[in-house]
UniProtKB/Swiss-Prot annotation:
Keywords: Disulfide bond, Electron transport, Redox-active center, Transport. This is Thioredoxin. InterPro entries: Thioredoxin (IPR005746), Thioredoxin-like_sf (IPR036249), Thioredoxin_CS (IPR017937), Thioredoxin_domain (IPR013766). The keyword Membrane does not apply. The gene is trxA. Disulfide bonds join 29-32. It comes from Staphylococcus epidermidis (strain ATCC 35984 / DSM 28319 / BCRC 17069 / CCUG 31568 / BM 3577 / RP62A).
Length: 104
């Protein structure tokens, strides 16, 4: 599955079931650009097991504030609508896969 962009208005409905890795990012963020290809690979690797979502914090500040996102990129794993794990900053694919695997 491709990465899905989410907004403040549809965020809750997109995370309500299953395992989701949400990338809180911004267009001007260098590390966010570095992690983008890693997330594309994960989206392919975890197709059918977990979804990768992206939320632009500049365009959607309410959701970022709700989950206390202070630095970007912040990646939060949600399981059935609840946050279960959080990683801040660039991470290699192996680290993110390990985080996701804990919640599948």
């Amino acid at each position: 599955m491709a990465i899905v962009k989410v907004t403040d208005s549809d965020f809750d409905s997109k995370i309500e079931s299953g395992v989701k890795l949400v990338d809180f990012w911004a267009t001007w963020c260098g590390p966010c650009k570095m992690i983008a290809p890693v997330l594309e690979e994960l989206a392919g690797d975890y197709d059918g097991k977990a979804d990768i979502l992206k939320l632009d914090v500049d365009e959607n500040p309410s959701t970022a504030a709700k989950y206390e996102v202070m630095s970007i990129p912040t990646l939060i794993v949600f399981k059935d609508g609840e946050p279960v794990d959080k990683v801040v900053g660039f991470q290699p694919k192996e680290n993110l896969a390990e985080v996701l695997d804990k919640h599948l």
